[in-house]
Protein backbone atom coordinates (compact mmCIF):
# COMPACT_ATOMS: atom_id res chain seq x y z
CA UNK A 1 0.00 0.00 0.00
CA UNK A 2 2.80 2.23 0.85
CA UNK A 3 4.55 1.42 -2.40
CA UNK A 4 1.39 2.01 -4.30
CA UNK A 5 1.02 5.43 -2.81
CA UNK A 6 4.57 6.26 -3.78
CA UNK A 7 4.04 5.15 -7.32
CA UNK A 8 0.85 7.16 -7.53
CA UNK A 9 2.47 10.22 -6.05
CA UNK A 10 5.64 10.26 -8.10
CA UNK A 11 4.90 8.56 -11.42
CA UNK A 12 6.94 11.07 -13.39
CA UNK A 13 10.07 10.72 -11.28
CA UNK A 14 9.98 6.97 -11.60
CA UNK A 15 9.83 7.13 -15.35
CA UNK A 16 12.63 9.63 -15.60
CA UNK A 17 15.10 8.55 -12.97
CA UNK A 18 14.38 4.93 -12.80
CA UNK A 19 13.86 2.57 -10.00
CA UNK A 20 17.30 3.06 -8.42
CA UNK A 21 16.78 6.70 -8.07
CA UNK A 22 13.42 6.20 -6.43
CA UNK A 23 14.92 3.69 -4.03
CA UNK A 24 17.74 6.07 -3.12
CA UNK A 25 15.34 8.92 -2.54
CA UNK A 26 13.14 6.76 -0.36
CA UNK A 27 16.08 5.91 1.83
CA UNK A 28 16.69 9.60 2.39
CA UNK A 29 14.27 11.01 4.85
CA UNK A 30 14.64 14.59 3.66
CA UNK A 31 13.57 13.63 0.22
CA UNK A 32 9.94 14.06 1.04
CA UNK A 33 10.49 17.65 2.23
CA UNK A 34 13.08 18.95 -0.27
CA UNK A 35 11.63 17.21 -3.29
CA UNK A 36 12.83 14.13 -5.09
CA UNK A 37 13.48 15.65 -8.53
CA UNK A 38 16.84 17.52 -8.09
CA UNK A 39 17.78 17.77 -11.72
CA UNK A 40 14.70 19.55 -12.95
CA UNK A 41 13.32 20.69 -9.61
CA UNK A 42 9.86 21.80 -8.86
CA UNK A 43 8.22 25.20 -9.29
CA UNK A 44 8.66 27.36 -6.15
CA UNK A 45 7.67 30.92 -5.19
CA UNK A 46 11.20 32.18 -5.80
CA UNK A 47 11.25 30.91 -9.33
CA UNK A 48 7.88 32.45 -10.03
CA UNK A 49 8.97 35.86 -8.61
CA UNK A 50 12.15 35.82 -10.63
CA UNK A 51 10.39 34.92 -13.81
CA UNK A 52 7.55 37.41 -13.58
CA UNK A 53 8.54 40.35 -11.40
CA UNK A 54 12.27 40.70 -12.09
CA UNK A 55 11.82 42.38 -15.50
CA UNK A 56 9.24 44.69 -13.98
CA UNK A 57 11.55 45.67 -11.13
CA UNK A 58 14.44 46.20 -13.54
CA UNK A 59 12.35 48.50 -15.70
CA UNK A 60 11.19 50.50 -12.69
CA UNK A 61 14.79 50.87 -11.47
CA UNK A 62 16.00 52.04 -14.88
CA UNK A 63 13.15 54.54 -15.09
CA UNK A 64 13.91 55.87 -11.62
CA UNK A 65 17.61 56.24 -12.45
CA UNK A 66 16.80 58.11 -15.63
CA UNK A 67 14.38 60.39 -13.82
CA UNK A 68 16.95 61.03 -11.08
CA UNK A 69 19.62 61.94 -13.62
CA UNK A 70 17.36 64.37 -15.42
CA UNK A 71 16.15 65.88 -12.16
CA UNK A 72 19.70 66.29 -10.88
CA UNK A 73 20.76 67.99 -14.11
CA UNK A 74 17.91 70.48 -13.87
CA UNK A 75 18.73 71.11 -10.23
CA UNK A 76 22.40 71.82 -11.02
CA UNK A 77 21.44 74.30 -13.76
CA UNK A 78 19.09 76.09 -11.39
CA UNK A 79 21.73 76.26 -8.65
CA UNK A 80 24.33 77.67 -11.07
CA UNK A 81 21.94 80.42 -12.13
CA UNK A 82 21.26 81.22 -8.49
CA UNK A 83 25.00 81.38 -7.79
CA UNK A 84 25.37 84.13 -10.35
CA UNK A 85 22.67 86.17 -8.65
CA UNK A 86 23.53 85.47 -5.03
CA UNK A 87 26.93 85.07 -3.36
CA UNK A 88 27.98 81.68 -2.20
CA UNK A 89 28.24 80.79 1.44
CA UNK A 90 31.20 82.63 3.04
CA UNK A 91 31.60 85.19 0.26
CA UNK A 92 30.26 88.00 2.43
CA UNK A 93 33.15 87.41 4.81
CA UNK A 94 35.68 87.89 1.99
CA UNK A 95 33.87 91.01 0.78
CA UNK A 96 33.82 92.60 4.22
CA UNK A 97 37.51 91.84 4.78
CA UNK A 98 38.46 93.35 1.44
CA UNK A 99 36.44 96.51 2.10
CA UNK A 100 38.06 96.81 5.53
CA UNK A 101 41.61 96.53 4.14
CA UNK A 102 41.07 98.70 1.06
CA UNK A 103 41.72 102.10 2.76
CA UNK A 104 45.03 100.87 4.17
CA UNK A 105 46.11 99.41 0.84
CA UNK A 106 45.15 102.64 -0.95
CA UNK A 107 47.17 104.71 1.54
CA UNK A 108 50.22 102.51 1.04
CA UNK A 109 49.91 102.81 -2.73
CA UNK A 110 49.76 106.62 -2.50
CA UNK A 111 52.78 106.74 -0.16
CA UNK A 112 54.79 104.54 -2.52
CA UNK A 113 53.94 106.76 -5.49
CA UNK A 114 54.93 109.94 -3.59
CA UNK A 115 58.20 108.42 -2.42
CA UNK A 116 59.06 107.29 -5.94
CA UNK A 117 58.33 110.74 -7.36
CA UNK A 118 60.43 112.50 -4.70
CA UNK A 119 63.33 110.14 -5.30
CA UNK A 120 63.26 110.78 -9.03
CA UNK A 121 63.17 114.57 -8.47
CA UNK A 122 65.95 114.73 -5.85
CA UNK A 123 68.26 112.40 -7.76
CA UNK A 124 68.53 113.53 -11.41
CA UNK A 125 70.24 111.28 -13.85
CA UNK A 126 73.97 111.46 -14.59
CA UNK A 127 73.33 112.78 -18.09
CA UNK A 128 71.27 115.68 -16.76
CA UNK A 129 74.01 116.54 -14.23
CA UNK A 130 76.61 116.49 -16.98
CA UNK A 131 74.49 118.70 -19.20
CA UNK A 132 73.93 121.20 -16.38
CA UNK A 133 77.63 121.36 -15.51
CA UNK A 134 78.68 121.75 -19.13
CA UNK A 135 76.06 124.45 -19.71
CA UNK A 136 77.30 126.37 -16.65
CA UNK A 137 80.93 126.07 -17.70
CA UNK A 138 80.19 127.20 -21.23
CA UNK A 139 77.98 130.12 -20.24
CA UNK A 140 80.35 131.65 -17.66
CA UNK A 141 83.30 132.30 -20.00
CA UNK A 142 81.00 133.72 -22.65
CA UNK A 143 79.63 136.26 -20.21
CA UNK A 144 83.11 137.22 -19.03
CA UNK A 145 84.38 137.66 -22.59
CA UNK A 146 81.41 139.83 -23.43
CA UNK A 147 81.97 142.02 -20.40
CA UNK A 148 85.67 142.39 -21.20
CA UNK A 149 85.04 143.22 -24.84
CA UNK A 150 82.33 145.77 -23.99
CA UNK A 151 84.54 147.41 -21.33
CA UNK A 152 87.52 147.61 -23.66
CA UNK A 153 85.37 149.07 -26.44
CA UNK A 154 83.90 151.72 -24.16
CA UNK A 155 87.35 152.63 -22.87
CA UNK A 156 88.70 152.98 -26.38
CA UNK A 157 85.80 155.22 -27.38
CA UNK A 158 86.24 157.49 -24.37
CA UNK A 159 90.02 157.67 -24.78
CA UNK A 160 89.56 158.61 -28.42
CA UNK A 161 87.08 161.29 -27.46
CA UNK A 162 89.42 162.74 -24.81
CA UNK A 163 92.42 162.67 -27.15
CA UNK A 164 90.61 164.41 -30.01
CA UNK A 165 88.54 166.72 -27.83
CA UNK A 166 85.42 166.10 -29.89
CA UNK A 167 81.92 165.60 -28.60
CA UNK A 168 79.51 164.97 -31.45
CA UNK A 169 76.74 162.59 -32.44
CA UNK A 170 79.16 159.94 -33.68
CA UNK A 171 80.55 159.28 -30.22
CA UNK A 172 77.04 159.36 -28.74
CA UNK A 173 75.98 156.73 -31.25
CA UNK A 174 79.01 154.60 -30.36
CA UNK A 175 78.18 154.85 -26.67
CA UNK A 176 74.61 153.71 -27.36
CA UNK A 177 75.84 150.71 -29.34
CA UNK A 178 78.23 149.73 -26.56
CA UNK A 179 75.48 150.13 -24.00
CA UNK A 180 73.20 147.79 -25.94
CA UNK A 181 75.92 145.15 -26.27
CA UNK A 182 76.95 145.40 -22.62
CA UNK A 183 74.91 143.42 -20.10
CA UNK A 184 77.12 143.87 -17.03
CA UNK A 185 75.69 144.87 -13.68
CA UNK A 186 75.91 148.50 -12.57
CA UNK A 187 78.37 149.28 -9.76
CA UNK A 188 77.01 152.75 -8.93
CA UNK A 189 73.36 153.36 -8.12
CA UNK A 190 72.54 157.04 -8.78
CA UNK A 191 69.22 156.76 -6.92
CA UNK A 192 70.76 155.69 -3.61
CA UNK A 193 74.27 157.01 -4.20
CA UNK A 194 75.80 153.69 -3.13
CA UNK A 195 78.63 151.76 -4.79
CA UNK A 196 78.40 147.99 -5.13
CA UNK A 197 81.97 146.84 -4.54
CA UNK A 198 80.94 143.23 -5.30
CA UNK A 199 79.87 144.08 -8.85
CA UNK A 200 81.54 141.80 -11.44
CA UNK A 201 82.12 144.86 -13.61
CA UNK A 202 84.87 146.02 -11.22
CA UNK A 203 86.83 142.85 -11.88
CA UNK A 204 87.38 142.11 -8.17
CA UNK A 205 89.82 145.01 -7.78
CA UNK A 206 88.04 146.22 -4.64
CA UNK A 207 89.03 143.03 -2.78
CA UNK A 208 92.67 142.61 -3.83
CA UNK A 209 95.83 143.75 -2.01
CA UNK A 210 95.22 147.25 -3.39
CA UNK A 211 91.50 147.20 -2.66
CA UNK A 212 91.51 150.08 -0.20
CA UNK A 213 93.46 152.34 -2.56
CA UNK A 214 91.12 151.42 -5.40
CA UNK A 215 88.03 152.14 -3.29
CA UNK A 216 89.40 155.52 -2.24
CA UNK A 217 90.28 156.58 -5.79
CA UNK A 218 87.14 155.20 -7.36
CA UNK A 219 84.73 156.69 -4.81
CA UNK A 220 86.55 160.04 -5.03
CA UNK A 221 86.10 160.08 -8.78
CA UNK A 222 82.44 159.01 -8.59
CA UNK A 223 81.47 161.66 -6.05
CA UNK A 224 83.68 164.39 -7.56
CA UNK A 225 81.93 167.62 -8.51
CA UNK A 226 84.91 169.59 -9.71
CA UNK A 227 85.60 170.69 -13.26
CA UNK A 228 87.21 168.80 -14.83
CA UNK A 229 85.78 165.86 -12.93
CA UNK A 230 88.18 164.10 -10.56
CA UNK A 231 90.72 166.91 -10.33
CA UNK A 232 91.05 166.52 -6.57
CA UNK A 233 91.54 162.73 -6.83
CA UNK A 234 94.96 162.82 -8.50
CA UNK A 235 96.87 161.96 -5.32
CA UNK A 236 94.64 158.97 -4.62
CA UNK A 237 95.06 157.62 -8.13
CA UNK A 238 98.82 157.99 -7.84
CA UNK A 239 98.74 156.03 -4.57
CA UNK A 240 96.68 153.34 -6.26
CA UNK A 241 99.15 153.19 -9.17
CA UNK A 242 102.05 152.87 -6.73
CA UNK A 243 100.29 149.97 -5.03
CA UNK A 244 99.80 148.31 -8.42
CA UNK A 245 103.54 148.54 -9.05
CA UNK A 246 104.24 146.81 -5.73
CA UNK A 247 102.18 143.80 -6.86
CA UNK A 248 103.05 143.30 -10.53
CA UNK A 249 102.10 139.62 -10.47
CA UNK A 250 98.47 140.56 -9.80
CA UNK A 251 98.13 143.92 -11.57
CA UNK A 252 100.42 143.17 -14.50
CA UNK A 253 98.06 144.67 -17.08
CA UNK A 254 97.60 147.88 -15.12
CA UNK A 255 101.32 148.33 -14.51
CA UNK A 256 102.14 147.65 -18.18
CA UNK A 257 99.71 150.29 -19.43
CA UNK A 258 100.96 152.89 -16.97
CA UNK A 259 104.59 152.24 -17.92
CA UNK A 260 103.77 152.66 -21.61
CA UNK A 261 102.04 155.96 -20.93
CA UNK A 262 104.97 157.16 -18.83
CA UNK A 263 107.39 156.22 -21.59
CA UNK A 264 105.33 158.15 -24.15
CA UNK A 265 105.21 161.26 -21.99
CA UNK A 266 108.95 161.08 -21.21
CA UNK A 267 109.96 160.78 -24.88
CA UNK A 268 110.79 164.25 -26.11
CA UNK A 269 112.83 165.29 -29.12
CA UNK A 270 116.46 166.11 -28.35
CA UNK A 271 117.20 169.82 -28.43
CA UNK A 272 120.18 171.35 -30.17
CA UNK A 273 122.75 173.51 -28.53
CA UNK A 274 121.17 176.54 -30.13
CA UNK A 275 117.87 175.72 -28.52
CA UNK A 276 119.60 175.29 -25.15
CA UNK A 277 121.15 178.72 -25.51
CA UNK A 278 117.81 180.28 -26.28
CA UNK A 279 116.00 181.85 -23.33
CA UNK A 280 113.26 179.88 -21.73
CA UNK A 281 109.70 180.59 -22.66
CA UNK A 282 107.79 182.89 -20.40
CA UNK A 283 105.72 181.39 -17.56
CA UNK A 284 102.54 182.13 -19.47
CA UNK A 285 103.51 179.47 -22.04
CA UNK A 286 103.85 176.79 -19.31
CA UNK A 287 100.34 177.38 -17.99
CA UNK A 288 99.12 174.32 -19.94
CA UNK A 289 100.90 171.79 -17.70
CA UNK A 290 97.98 171.35 -15.22
CA UNK A 291 95.66 170.66 -18.12
CA UNK A 292 97.97 167.96 -19.40
CA UNK A 293 98.03 166.41 -15.93
CA UNK A 294 94.26 166.40 -15.86
CA UNK A 295 94.13 164.77 -19.31
CA UNK A 296 96.54 162.07 -18.18
CA UNK A 297 94.50 161.50 -15.04
CA UNK A 298 91.29 161.19 -17.04
CA UNK A 299 92.93 158.66 -19.34
CA UNK A 300 94.04 156.66 -16.34
CA UNK A 301 90.56 156.77 -14.86
CA UNK A 302 89.06 155.61 -18.15
CA UNK A 303 91.43 152.66 -18.23
CA UNK A 304 90.38 151.58 -14.74
CA UNK A 305 86.66 152.37 -14.82
CA UNK A 306 84.01 150.13 -16.51
CA UNK A 307 81.81 151.60 -19.19
CA UNK A 308 78.56 151.21 -17.25
CA UNK A 309 79.92 153.26 -14.33
CA UNK A 310 81.30 155.98 -16.62
CA UNK A 311 77.95 156.42 -18.37
CA UNK A 312 76.02 156.65 -15.09
CA UNK A 313 78.46 159.23 -13.75
From Swiss-Prot:
The keyword Transport applies. It is found in: Mitochondrion inner membrane. Residues 140-150 have a biased composition (Basic and acidic residues). One of its GO terms (molecular function) is protein-disulfide reductase activity. Residues 1-61 form a transit peptide. Cu(2+) or Zn(2+). GO terms for cellular component: mitochondrial inner membrane; mitochondrial intermembrane space; mitochondrion. Residues 62 are mitochondrial matrix. Disulfide bonds join 199-201, 210-243, 220-233. Residues 116-169, 255-313 are annotated as: Disordered. Residues 268-289 have a biased composition (Polar residues). The chain crosses the membrane at residues 63-73. Residues 207-251 form the CHCH domain. It is a single-pass type II membrane protein. A motif (Cx9C motif 2) lies at residues 233-243. Coiled coil: none annotated. Residues 74-313 are mitochondrial intermembrane. InterPro entries: CHCH (IPR010625), CHCHD4 (IPR039289). It comes from the Eukaryota. Keywords: Disulfide bond, Membrane, Mitochondrion, Mitochondrion inner membrane, Oxidoreductase, Protein transport, Redox-active center, Signal-anchor, Transit peptide, Translocation, Transmembrane, Transmembrane helix, Transport. Its cofactor is Cu(2+); Zn(2+). Required for the import and folding of small cysteine-containing proteins (small Tim) in the mitochondrial intermembrane space (IMS). Forms a redox cycle with ERV1 that involves a disulfide relay system. Precursor proteins to be imported into the IMS are translocated in their reduced form into the mitochondria. The oxidized form of MIA40 forms a transient intermolecular disulfide bridge with the reduced precursor protein, resulting in oxidation of the precursor protein that now contains an intramolecular disulfide bond and is able to undergo folding in the IMS. PANTHER family: COILED-COIL-HELIX-COILED-COIL-HELIX DOMAIN CONTAINING 4. Monomer. The CHCH domain contains a conserved twin Cys-X(9)-Cys motif which is required for import and stability of MIA40 in mitochondria. This is Mitochondrial intermembrane space import and assembly protein 40. The lineage of its organism: Eukaryota, Fungi, Dikarya, Ascomycota, Taphrinomycotina. The gene is mia40.
Amino acid sequence: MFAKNLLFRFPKCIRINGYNNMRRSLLQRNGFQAGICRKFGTATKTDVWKGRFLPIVSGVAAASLTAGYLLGKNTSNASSSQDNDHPVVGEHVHTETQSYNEPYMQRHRIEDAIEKKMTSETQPSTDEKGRKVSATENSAPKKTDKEKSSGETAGNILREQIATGKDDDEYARKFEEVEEESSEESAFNPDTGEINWDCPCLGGMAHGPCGEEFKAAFSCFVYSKSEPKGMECLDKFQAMQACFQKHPEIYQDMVGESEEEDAETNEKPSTTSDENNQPQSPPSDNASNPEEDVMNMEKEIVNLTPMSVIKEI
